[in-house]
Amino acid sequence: MSWIAPEITRVHPQFAELVGDERSLADAWLDFHRQTLLWKCGGLTAEQLKLRQVAPSNLSLLGLVRHMAEVERDWFRTRFAGERVGYLYCTDDDLTAEFDVETADAESDLATYAREIELVRRTTAGRSLDETFTDPRREVEMSLRWVYSVMIQEYARHNGHADLLRERVDGAVGH
């Protein structure tokens, strides 16, 4: 029997966090978007996750998972925390390699994504949204709040792509 992406249950902040401090709401919305991407992958085979269904784009559901693992690592661990961790899939010569999924191992890539999320949670635990850092690429001061905001919009945008990709794979729709 071939591997199938696990199905997950999402916790929608609209129903779980109606009142809360800014950090709790930011964490809830970021986690919701993380869960949404995995939810869109749930129940699909590795081959289905690799399908590129919206020509001429090279986007696939697995490519989006790999991309978001790279983005999480880059913004939270490399830029914010200053960790010296390399790319997961990309190289300095190919900054979009995460979308090259022909020979990718979907099960391993989803596990890598989950590990990266856990490492990011540890990195940001107890840190103030007001905490600032100098972005090494742009050489400008940024806050953790800004990183949360950009990550929520990044997921929202790519989850829209995931909606279309999933519908093209098997007709499943939903938000």
Question: Residues of each region from the PLM?
Answer:
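Active-site rim elements
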Residues: 21-26, 104-107
